[in-house]
Regions:
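Mixed-charge, Lys/Arg-enriched low-complexity segments
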Residues: 7, 14-15, 22-43, 83-121
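Amphipathic, interaction-prone secondary-structure segments
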Residues: 42-78
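Surface-exposed beta-strand edges and their flanking turn/coil or helix-capping segments
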Residues: 20, 68-70, 79-80, 105
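Intrinsically disordered, low-complexity Ser/Thr/Pro-rich tracts
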Residues: 3-6, 36, 53-56, 62-64, ...
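Short aromatic-glycine-(Arg/Gly/Cys) micro-motifs in beta-strand/loop hairpins
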Residues: 2-13, 72-82
């Protein structure tokens, strides 16, 4: 059963069960690598490191996703249609969160998500 994204004043929380956020970030990073190798004209990866991913899609949208191992959060900046949007830091507290957070990031990566106002920092 999927979890839900709960918006707080300063952060987002994925309401599910606990698995490490680092694993979620690593899966997302590998997903970007896979997309780069298989959709050659669709994505331009600018940086792909253990704690940061920066890439641009052919429609001009670009994304910077960082993982902070000290605070254990993912922070995402999205540049959509010449607009700079910073998504609130993502904190994950309880158990099945790996799949949910990965799905959230996957939706963002594939332009399938409607970014809600309460998610914006």
């Amino acid at each position: 059963m999927p979890g839900k994204i709960v918006a707080h004043d300063t952060h987002l929380r994925i309401d599910t069960e606990f698995i490490e956020l680092k694993d979620c970030f690593e899966a997302f990073r590998r997903g970007v690598e896979y997309r780069e190798k298989n959709d050659v004209d669709d994505i331009l990866v600018i940086c792909n490191a253990p704690d940061i991913i920066e890439y641009q899609l052919k429609n001009g949208d670009s994304f910077i996703v960082t993982y902070d191992p000290i605070h254990q959060i993912i922070v995402m900046r999205v540049f959509l249609h010449d607009e700079d949007i910073t998504i609130k830091p993502i904190y994950i507290y309880n158990n099945r969160e790996y799949q949910i957070a990965c799905e959230f990031l996957r939706q963002v990566m594939h332009d399938k998500i409607d970014i809600k106002d309460e998610w914006i920092a």
